Amino acid sequence: MLFSSIPFLYTFLPCVLILYFLVPGWLKNTVLLLSSLFFYAWGEPRFVVFMVIAIVQGYVFGLLAEKFRDRPKQTKLCLWASAAISLGLLCYCKYADFFISGFNTLTGLSLPLLHVALPIGISFYTFQILSYVIDVYRGDVTAQRNLIDLAAYVAMFPQLIAGPIVRYADIAPQLKHRTHTLADAAYGARRFILGLSKKVLLANVLYELISAYKSAANVSVLFVWLYAAAYILHLYFDFSGYSDMAIGLGRIFGFHFIENFNYPYISASVTEFWRRWHMSLGSWFRDYVYIPLGGNRVSKAKWFRNIFIVWLLTGLWHGAAWTFILWGLFFAVFLTAEKLWYGQALAQTRFLKHLYVLLLIAVSFVIFDAASVSGAFRTIASLFGLGGLPRSDALARYYFDSYSGVFLVAIVGATPLPAKIVRQFSEDGPGKKIMSVVEPVVLLGLLAVVTAYLVDGSFNPFLYFRF
């Protein structure tokens, strides 16, 4: 089930909210869990089995890891057993055919592919369970003794499908003791509607340009650049829109989820970009892979190793394809180069450093979206006029004229400027009174326009659902 769908907005969500606020406090997590399982089973019920197995083993091994904390060998065995099951399920569902195909290529064999369907959101909930058991093993959190509460944490539908990757430590107190206020509900509704609008009115519209590019028989350099610009903006509004909706829904239910995006396209370095983009994933790899490997407190050779391991895994986390591996290693190379060579030089040239980051982002997401490594290189070559394409053509100029307004809104919307303007108007004074009237009207208007688009529009799932 999609957040940006009529059944979710006008049937599922209202019913869940009514039931959730009718039941007593001790039943709220049960309602949240059952509704989340229904939400997840809507598309493919059999995938619920994988999630239930992952939750139950995390629950059992979390308790055992805590019980045997004074026995290092036993508690470490619990950690590794849980990790093996979690990662085993993930690898079977997501990477089996990739590894079989690679093995066939290396050996010349023809082992049959398994053609395993990928359960939606498995990468997200696997990382949540892994972090929970690791934190119990480290003694950072107390093991959850109530299976329903732990299952509600993992399966909670606001963040189940595409994050943020919520740490158990961040919301453990809220699982038992959380407050529900009108202020939180209003904030949550506002955040949800804004995220929904980003998804439907910007990401979906930009996706139409991307589809036109991919279906065109012939393209020009201008069209390739339009595609690259549309894709990076589409990906941002698609994913950050989902995160906004997840955070908003979580707040309505009394949970305070971490932020996942902080205007990444204003970054002045690749390092800064990854502090602002998909922050929950970046912090997960930092705390559970990079730092345990030694971080930057090791020799230069080991630091290189740590960087490349983290980014190889980051690429693989996004998908079982050589393009994702290349995408991860692409960032590893430029992060390393920034740290060692030209990072200080970038700090001296403000305009050029922003241009540099945007150019690298465009190239990186061309790789990310490519169907093959060779296709990625062809598109990158075309960006720089090396593919033998004409500079422009009638179709590219048509889309440039047609989408110039959308691009303008999207570019401004990807900066802190709109939020800054709203914040200034919302401060004490006449502006605050005006905003108290204007904001609800604008939000209701956005919801009405989004609803009209959804009634008349085509199916367009969130891009990060496939991860």
Regions found by a protein language model. Give the residues of each.
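Membrane-embedded transmembrane alpha-helical bundles that form the catalytic cores
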Residues: 1-466
